[in-house]
């Protein structure tokens, strides 16, 4: 009951009880309204829990991972082969023996983790729902055992994050097997106009990184783009995302970021109308 009353207060709904007294009953200052998707993802990663990000194409799943670890090792499972993901064995004619060759991505992750042992490094399995079933099975073993090909352990400071498009958003998407699905904590990305507008004016160097190192300064979304999306919102029209009809390109958060880059590169904000 006390928890319910506290939640009602923090959402500014009227209660007959004295607000100040109820706030004193919340000594830990819980504020449920300020927990973002990024907070949840970050908490899972720091807790060494493998995370699966769901969402529509262009919703910024990859961008959220890169916010936390700009140097994350991205593995596009759509294009992965068993050899590229799991390594391979080659014959050595000199010794007459088979030699195990580690996959390139694994070598890179090991080097990053060794060079920066106090930093968490993310192994990002992108487009996992578009991967071949055989590749998904290998990814499952990596997530389950924390090792590649049953031979090479992931470093202690490596974490796994995966992402995939919804089945109704990609014709080539495959349903994950139940064991693989259940190995992840699942976060469903929902990019709203309000959350995007907040992100759009946040300088990228202000992101709360996992490593807290100084990053190259990146530009915020171009003011012309921001103003247009905001104006359309007040006109009760969602211009951030439009449905794809199979003929013309649709709008989504990723395409607005592309348009922003064009306006910055050309220095011609009047191009906004043509881009729209």
Residue ranges and their predicted role:
Residues 3-276:
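C-terminal regulatory/interaction module of P-loop NTP-utilizing enzymes
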